[in-house]
C-alpha cells in the first residue's frame, strides 16, 4: 500500500513539474523575440502596421522593454493625431482600433490623445463597418480594452 502511495505521489509530482521546462524554454524564446522586435522596429509609429502591432505584442508580454520605447511611441502618436486633427483615416476605421489597442496596452487613455477622443469615431456604425466585419470586430475589441 505504501509503495502505491509513493508511486502515485511521484507520478503526480512529475506531471506537475513537466510543464516547468517548457515554460522556461518559452521565456527564453519570448525574450529573444522581444530583442528582435525592438532591434527591428526601433521607432514604432502610428499607421505603421509593424509599429502598432509590435507595441501591442511587447506591452502585453512579460518581456522587459525600456520604458522609453513605449513613451516615445505615445509621443509620436500624440503628435500625429494633432497633425491630422484627430482624423486617422476617412475610410479605414481599423486604424483607430489598432492605435487604441496599442495605447491601452501601454496604459494610455485613448479618449484624450492630443486633445482628441480616438474612441468617438468608432461610434459611427457606417464608417466602422465600411471594411466589412473586421471593422466591427476590431472596434468592439478596442472599445472593450479601453474600459479596462
Residue ranges and their predicted role:
Residues 2-10, 19-148:
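Preference for long, amphipathic alpha-helical scaffolds in soluble/luminal domains
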Residues 13:
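Short regulatory/linker helices and ligand/cofactor-binding micro-motifs at input modules
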Amino acid at each position: 500500500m505504501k509503495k502505491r502511495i509513493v508511486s502515485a505521489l511521484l507520478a503526480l509530482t512529475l506531471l506537475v513539474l513537466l510543464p516547468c521546462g517548457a515554460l522556461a524554454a518559452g521565456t527564453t524564446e519570448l525574450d529573444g523575440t522581444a530583442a528582435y522586435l525592438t532591434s527591428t522596429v526601433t521607432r514604432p509609429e502610428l499607421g505603421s502596421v509593424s509599429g502598432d502591432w509590435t507595441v501591442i505584442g511587447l506591452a502585453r508580454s512579460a518581456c522587459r522593454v525600456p520604458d522609453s520605447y513605449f513613451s516615445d511611441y505615445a509621443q509620436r502618436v500624440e503628435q500625429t493625431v494633432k497633425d491630422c486633427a484627430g482624423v486617422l483615416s476617412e475610410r479605414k476605421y481599423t486604424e483607430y482600433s489598432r492605435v487604441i489597442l496599442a495605447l491601452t496596452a501601454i496604459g494610455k487613455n485613448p479618449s484624450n490623445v492630443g486633445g482628441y477622443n480616438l474612441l468617438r469615431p468608432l461610434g459611427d456604425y457606417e464608417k466602422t463597418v465600411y471594411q466589412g466585419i473586421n471593422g466591427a470586430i476590431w472596434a468592439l475589441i478596442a472599445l472593450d480594452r479601453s474600459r479596462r
